[in-house]
Amino acid sequence: MPKASEIKKGFAIESNGKTLLVKDIEVTTPGGRGGSKIYKMRCTDLATGARVEERYKSDDVVETVEMNKKAVSFSYVDGDDYIFMDNADYSQYVFKHADVEDDLLFINEDTQGIHVILVNGESVGLELPSSVELVIEETDPSIKGASASARTKPARLSTGLVVQVPEYIATGDRVIINTAERKYMSRA
């Protein structure tokens, strides 16, 4: 069984008899000598949908649950439901808007590399690719000769996500965004 320091976002863990899907991990290092790192995991209870916070020291052993992943593509929206289609057998996976709200900031009809996470045969979440290509919908005008400076400006992307981009980037440019850090990486 892995230690808490080896658990990543998207893992399914067993805690107090509940199966939890890890949505976010925050690492803190307490002051003082010899203090081990504390891993605060924000999770969703797969049975009830409730949000749960678990805390572990870096060397605590955490019980994981076996997961499967299937490659999917975003298909369409039906009211409050977001439908993703299996790339192999064309079966569909339905997610409520609230369940995938954060992930939707990185997904458009062209996004490749999305995986649905299955626990005990049931779809519980999405795994995004490490980076996605998106179009800048709105940003301040680019400044000629600004490539020499390291200043940034906010830009709203086609999915609604707002990131800081270099000053030379203009509206309509295609950019690559790191999904884990929510940061600009490069032009596409």
UniProtKB/Swiss-Prot annotation:
CDD domains: S1_EF-P_repeat_1, S1_EF-P_repeat_2. One of its GO terms (biological process) is peptide biosynthetic process. One of its GO terms (molecular function) is translation elongation factor activity. One of its GO terms (cellular component) is cytoplasm. InterPro entries: Elong-fact-P_C, NA-bd_OB-fold, Rib_uL2_dom2, Transl_elong_fac_P/YeiP, Transl_elong_KOW-like, Transl_elong_p-like_YeiP, Transl_elong_P/YeiP_cen, Transl_elong_P/YeiP_CS. Belongs to the elongation factor P family. This is Elongation factor P-like protein. It comes from Vibrio vulnificus (strain YJ016). The lineage of its organism: Bacteria, Pseudomonadati, Pseudomonadota, Gammaproteobacteria, Vibrionales.
